[in-house]
Every structure is written in C-alpha cells, then in structure tokens.
A protein has these predicted regions:
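Conserved beta-strand segments that form the floor/walls of ligand-binding pockets within enzyme
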Residues: 6, 25, 34, 49, ...
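Short acidic-glycine-tyrosine-enriched beta hairpin
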Residues: 37-53
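Double-stranded beta-helix
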Residues: 5, 57-92
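A short, compositionally biased micro-patch
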Residues: 8, 18-19, 26, 51, ...
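A short glycine-rich, His/Asp/Glu-containing loop-to-beta-strand
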Residues: 1-15, 20, 73
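Glycine- and acidic-residue-biased ligand/ion/polar-headgroup-sensing regions
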Residues: 19-31, 36
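Short beta-strand His + acidic residue motifs that chelate non-heme Fe in jelly-roll/DSBH
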Residues: 14-15, 33-34, 50, 56-63
Length: 92
C-alpha cells in the first residue's frame, strides 16, 4: 500500500515498531526521525526504509509542513508499547 503523510509543524508520532518494512520518500519540508535511538533528518528527496521491529518515531520540528509518500505491505501492523498492535488504515 502507498499513501501520503502530511505532518504539520509540531506534529509527532509515538515511538512504535512495525511488522514489515515501511519506506518514506520525503517530498517537501523536513522531519526529525529517531530510529533505535539514533537521530536522523529527513528532507525533500531523501528516502528512509524502516525495517521491522526497529523502534521508530517521526516529528516535524520545522515551520513548514512535512510531506512524504510512504509504502508498506498490505496487512503490515504498527506496535505501540503498552497500547498494543494495530493495522494502520492505509495498510489494510
């Protein structure tokens, strides 16, 4: 499945893991990514692939929206510690 993500300034995801690979291709803006506790910046033109079971979060610390195209296998799940597993609507 493929979808667009739009993170407004100040928006963030909770730390989570995935059951399958998830790929992000940044289209505009920038985002701060934490991957297994390591900080990365994702800017327009960058690609990031998050492997299964890696702790991951993304946030927009900038002044402009961050937009990306994401891909994940249909049926892939996200796991938030203490909250359980769910299938993101775009991966259903």
């Amino acid at each position: 499945s493929a979808w667009r993500v739009l993170l407004q300034p100040g928006a963030a995801s909770p730390e989570h893991t995935l059951t399958s690979d998830e790929a992000f291709v940044a289209l505009r803006g920038s985002a701060h990514v934490e991957l297994e506790g390591e900080a990365h910046e994702l800017t327009a033109g960058d690609c990031l692939v998050v492997a299964p079971r890696l702790r991951f979060s993304i946030r927009n610390d900038g002044r402009e929206p961050f937009e990306a195209v994401c891909c994940m296998a249909a049926g892939g799940q996200a796991v938030v510690e203490g909250e359980g597993t769910f299938v993101p609507p775009w991966a259903a």
